[in-house]
From Swiss-Prot:
It is a single-pass type II membrane protein. The modification Phosphotyrosine is found at residues 139, 144. This is Inactive dipeptidyl peptidase 10. The lineage of its organism: Eukaryota, Metazoa, Chordata, Craniata, Vertebrata. Keywords: Cell membrane, Glycoprotein, Membrane, Phosphoprotein, Signal-anchor, Transmembrane, Transmembrane helix. GO terms for molecular function: potassium channel regulator activity; serine-type peptidase activity. N-glycosylation is important for cell surface expression, specially at Asn-258, which is crucial.
Amino acid sequence: MKQEQQPTPGARATQSQPADQELGSNSPPQRNWKGIAIALLVILVVCSLITMSVILLTPDELTNSSETRLSLEELLGKGFGLHNPEPRWINDTVVVYKTNNGHVMKLNTESNASTLLLDNSTFVTFKASRHSLSPDLKYVLLAYDVKQIFHYSFTASYLIYNIHTGEVWELNPPEVEDSVLQYAAWGVQGQQLIYIFENNIYYQPDIKSSSLRLTSSGKEGIIFNGIADWLYEEELLHSHIAHWWSPDGERLAFLMINDSLVPNMIIPRFTGALYPKAKQYPYPKAGQANPSVKLYVVNLYGPTHTLELMPPDIFKSREYYITMVKWVSNTRTVVRWLNRPQNISILTLCESTTGACSRKYEMTSDTWLSKQNEEPVFSRDGSKFFMTVPVKQGGRGEFHHIAMFLVQSKSEQITVRHLTSGNWEVIRILAYDETTQKIYFLSTESSPQGRQLYSASTEGLLNRDCISCNFMKEDCTYFDASFSPMNQHFLLFCEGPKVPVVSLHITDNPSRYFLLENNSVMKETIQKKKLAKRETRILHIDDYELPLQLSFPKDFMEKNQYALLLIMDEEPGGQMVTDKFHVDWDSVLIDTDNVIVARFDGRGSGFQGLKVLQEIHRRIGSVEAKDQVAAVKYLLKQPYIDSKRLSIFGKGYGGYIASMILKSDEKFFKCGAVVAPISDMKLYASAFSERYLGMPSKEESTYQASSVLHNIHGLKEENLLIIHGTADTKVHFQHSAELIKHLIKAGVNYTLQVYPDEGYHISDKSKHHFYSTILRFFSDCLKEEVSVLPQEPEEDE
């Protein structure tokens, strides 16, 4: 540095030149090359310092010029597809999973060695889109011509494929060719097969045996054996499967659902024929006749014998649902019975050899009972079982926590011991290890927005340990898990906040793991995109602490003003503000239109205790709207929110809440878009509407107050987009038709986008148009208004 402060050698040389030297002299000038080099070096150092200063003082997001904005085409492309390896435990040391390339592999958990079971070309050859491996790993069921029916159910044709020989044959009922089945799957032992055709159950002891029809009462649209009708699939079981294997494969429990008194809903199909066709299916609306249900157990070995398991006496003269069935031994099942108002639940333990059932636990509520699908976890001898129950935690109300039930043999008396407590929720019990006397579960103890895997001792001091808290803790705070049959290993599913990964762990030493899927393609794609930054805040509303999540544009600056989009949840009891990885159509809007997206879990949302959840009892539509408006009022106090550019979006129940907010007296929103909106709870499913509002015959005023159609004049000031598929079997197009009829009568302008013959979930072929419609609507509505100055008249020359 001292050299920089001195005159350069070159300067001294110039000054020492002879004074009488002529300017035009031919003699070469005397140059100091060493001095010139030093001068250039100094200039280079100074330039480097300036460049470094610019880089250090420039925000990171501005320096990474390789980042590009996210487009809808990219979002729907392969680069943004998360791969689910669909891992399944075969036994304690074998996991079967599917690679990103479509190969089906077998992983040995002791050696971490993978073996190819099924090449991806097999799926191409047979045009199969679904598969299922036999328990002995010798055969695979391949489903082709798959057609979705409702949310979970589908029909398909099936092939049985020999993995080792390549031999293949069709799976058909006796004397039927080219059959379309409602369900087909392997049993729990060897090559047992079960399939459902025309609402009847068929059984094969192995792939070479003849099929045995287990039921004969099945009738399309009326009697459902082993498979759910719409109501049970969508609102009660949350699955289309309504049958359950005993652990040894010798017995099968199944529901017989009778819809003979249930009114039918008609869904027209407008395209593809000269005259529209229609399909109808039983759909009980609020207050209408419900399906009746019976539970049977059939013995599969020896002469087939079918036995009915009877409901508790209290339900024999009442309407009831069956919400959970589970085998706890080779001969005993545990069953949950729920009354129609959904405020009385009884858990019974049934002996399948005699049909005798004993009551083990009863729950009642002044509102409604949640978590009625939860399966209790039993010890091997059945002397104890574990289940989550609501436990009061001071002024915060009740939270779901683990209780251990000690069963008295040949008696209905039980002893209860609570294993966890606190202002947090146990999400699900995963396993009980009798050797270590530990219970494994997921909970929100670390954060209401996260999910961590914990263990707790069931004896002594009930010590609790977080197993997942230190695993990839910068990237993963939201987990799910699955334990092997003997609990020696577990699969850990990291679902966010960073790109999801799936790993295999040893239970005794969880820090040792094998990475099953890291979604590397998605990670590489994400790194090249200017995706939103998320931030969670806690709002205090009516003595509640409620979470608000904001997604900011990557180059967000607080001095600027931004438009706001508020997104509603699709279901009551859900959770919008989580640590789960999220990239969706709203990510495109944030990136391309510099919009801030807000999600808020107000009263009526889940996983924050029953007090928050059940505030909407008999008040659905009003409490949620009030809290969302309170969140908007908070946001309007922030200097970066443009009060003239506010919008709202919701689908299904979320569309219902968005509509209730838009028609309220609070006029914040410039526009709103609703997809398949529920407009009147009387038109919606019985189990849903009655859970929150009761029976319409007794709660007429409550139903009227909860209807969007009531006092609809409030929608006059907003720009409203309604989107609906005409073949929606969940929220019928009838809801939008009634809404539009009332809008026209009230003189309200609206925009309607209809998707002919599309359901609640828009198909892949229409998805680009669907998202484009929503994005274009919000882009036009939320664009910044530029003030145009009046032009001064030009002066005449």
